[in-house]
Swiss-Prot record:
InterPro entries: ACP (IPR003231), ACP-like_sf (IPR036736), PP-bd_ACP (IPR009081)
Record protein name field: Acyl carrier protein homolog
Modified residues (O-(pantetheine 4'-phosphoryl)serine): 32
A Pfam family it matches: PP-binding
Segments forming domain Carrier: 1-72
Top-level taxon of the source organism: Bacteria
GO biological process, alphabetically ordered: lipid A biosynthetic process
GO cellular component: cytosol; membrane
An MF annotation (GO) of this entry: acyl binding
Organism: Mycoplasmopsis pulmonis (strain UAB CTIP) (Mycoplasma pulmonis)
Post-translational modification: 4'-phosphopantetheine is transferred from CoA to a specific serine of the apo-ACP-like protein.
Keywords: Fatty acid biosynthesis, Fatty acid metabolism, Lipid biosynthesis, Lipid metabolism, Phosphopantetheine, Phosphoprotein
Pathway this chain belongs to: Lipid metabolism; fatty acid biosynthesis
Length: 73
């Protein structure tokens, strides 16, 4: 499964809202605590580290997709 699909599938478990790459976390009902918990899962799944500074810059689903794609190379 590609990174984008995996992330959207995982995020879909946290909300009933439809999730797309352009979805803002604030609009789909995922708060900062949910995001921190999810990032921990992402770090383990993709064997990467996401810094607190990088986490603060994540506002929409595509932000995290791009970040993980960059770190997975």
């Amino acid at each position: 499964m590609a990174i984008k699909e995996w992330i959207i599938t995982q995020l879909s478990k946290l909300t009933k809202n439809k999730i797309t790459e352009e979805s803002l976390f604030s609009e789909i009902g995922i708060d900062s605590l949910d995001l921190v918990e999810h990032v921990s899962d992402l770090e383990q799944h993709f064997d990467i580290e996401i810094s607190d500074e990088e986490l603060l810059n994540i506002k929409k689903v595509n932000d995290i997709i791009v970040l993980i794609e960059q770190k997975s190379k």
